[in-house]
Amino acid sequence: MKTKPVGRLVVCGVGLIGGSFALALKAAGLVREVVGVGRSQASLERALALGVIDRAAADWAQALAGAEVVLLAMPVGQTEAVVKAMAPHLAPGTLVTDAGSTKRNVIEAFYLHLGGHLAHAVPGHPIAGAEKSGCEAADATLFRGRKVVLTPLPENEPGSVLRVAQLWQACGAIIREMSPQEHDRVFAAVSHLPHVLAYALVHDLAERANAEQLFEYAAGGFRDFTRIAASHPEMWRDICLVNRQAILAELDQYLSELAFIRALLLSANGPGLEEVFAKARAARMAWGERYVNDANGGGSDE
Amino acid sequence: MKTKPVGRLVVCGVGLIGGSFALALKAAGLVREVVGVGRSQASLERALALGVIDRAAADWAQALAGAEVVLLAMPVGQTEAVVKAMAPHLAPGTLVTDAGSTKRNVIEAFYLHLGGHLAHAVPGHPIAGAEKSGCEAADATLFRGRKVVLTPLPENEPGSVLRVAQLWQACGAIIREMSPQEHDRVFAAVSHLPHVLAYALVHDLAERANAEQLFEYAAGGFRDFTRIAASHPEMWRDICLVNRQAILAELDQYLSELAFIRALLLSANGPGLEEVFAKARAARMAWGERYVNDANGGGSDE
């Protein structure tokens, strides 16, 4: 069943995610007008020039006039300020959703500032992205086959949740639902912590006196392990701040794992090390076969 | 200056590295006969069938008769036993080299068992590999543009070091020299530790009650961060055991870095986190531009 087109879509934060959502709905013939709003006038002008948005709004009053759907897609640290600023201008029927990598803080902002609007404020998180950021990298096909996690509120009207789900499905995405607490714990483990660990390794090496020498001999294993250390610092600062309790819990769990491996190394426990490595390898290979078109396979190249 | 062909090359451990060395020298017209030796008869037969080796030797006496060059390319944990076993059958002029990812243990084995042969026993480490292992994955082009680190002994005859260097150069490799201590410290930092960290993360998640759920939401950042967790457990067990002191030192350094980041998270220190992330990103991007044809770029996709 095809969902009906959005008359006016407002995208706050026209970067990779917001821009791709706009382009995907345009490609599907499911949006008549896209209005961009954001803190950077320059990036709104680029989005306009690229046809990602049809119009840039000067303020929330202008942006929200006649808006049917609003997607919040700026770094998660801005959520509360943005929700607070938009709230007074929101018409009763406008559907609000977001694309933040963390959910508890988004929900807190909704409860704080959208108290009368909770029927139509549906938190979401598309598990998609690319190496690039900014609206120049926006791509109508970005969400094809990717998961979008919705964490609906008890107050949400079922029709609003369905509408958000259908719009993402029209972008090619697969919908999952979770509680916000569960969402934030799961992504702390499989996404936020790995980012922190990769940043930590590169930072550690880069600050050494012999950093030049170390980097000269780093090869393909290092390349892949640290690829996410080139991620956007502000975005990841925000994720770390808003989800810091779950990330700390995951970090502490990981430190226990490292303490265990450290003991195996200290005691030169070959069978113990091989068992850990073999279990990890089996789990990684099973994951690769099941969840990704893992063209590059797994394994070392050093 | 083209180096002269090797009359008879012996490869111990005909896997990805040993097999690729044989194929590369064959492709360059620089070897007349390749003799394989190893603990697995089945893998020697596959290497024979694939034309990676010309003959499989039943024992070291047979393998070393008339051998001009020997490459040791089995997992590093076998080095001492292999060197001990070959020593009695080694003719005075035969050149011995190796491809181990660690060097101090190889040198210890040379000093222990090749006391009269040190002029011609040259330790080396090709920084190359691929996702696959085994002689089926052997590839004549594997070493093109890759570094090979030699860690010559004071006892080495300059002509022997030059000969080893020229053979690797004929495979397309770039030669570097380092002390074995420096080699083992550098690779503990940029290769061995990242492997341990990736194994640790996957092992940690795989052992949880909700492992299925966690893996379901893992995406591209996790894929690349953990690719090396699919590496060969025996090979990495051996590397961890023989280089455990350097790896422990690197692990402890990394644990200090994580303690620092943990403190930033605990205190919700946004500027501090952003500074670490921004420094890491700058270093990772500079590395990507300088050292790799980093087609995939860096950055997050979550």
Describe these PLM feature segments.
Chain A
Residues 1-66:
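NAD(P)+-binding Rossmann beta1-loop-alpha1 motif at the extreme N-terminus of oxidoreductases
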Residues 8, 33, 120, 147, ...:
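Residues at the starts of beta-strands that form the adenosine-phosphate
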Residues 39, 74, 99:
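Short beta->alpha hinge that forms the Motif I/post-I loop of the SAM-binding pocket
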Residues 60-90, 94-95:
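Rossmann-like NAD(P)-binding element
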Residues 84-136:
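Rossmann-like NAD(P)(H) cofactor-binding subdomain of soluble oxidoreductases
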Residues 142-227:
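Internal alpha-helical scaffold of NAD(P)-dependent oxidoreductase catalytic cores
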Residues 211-280:
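Interdomain hinge/lid region at the active-site interface
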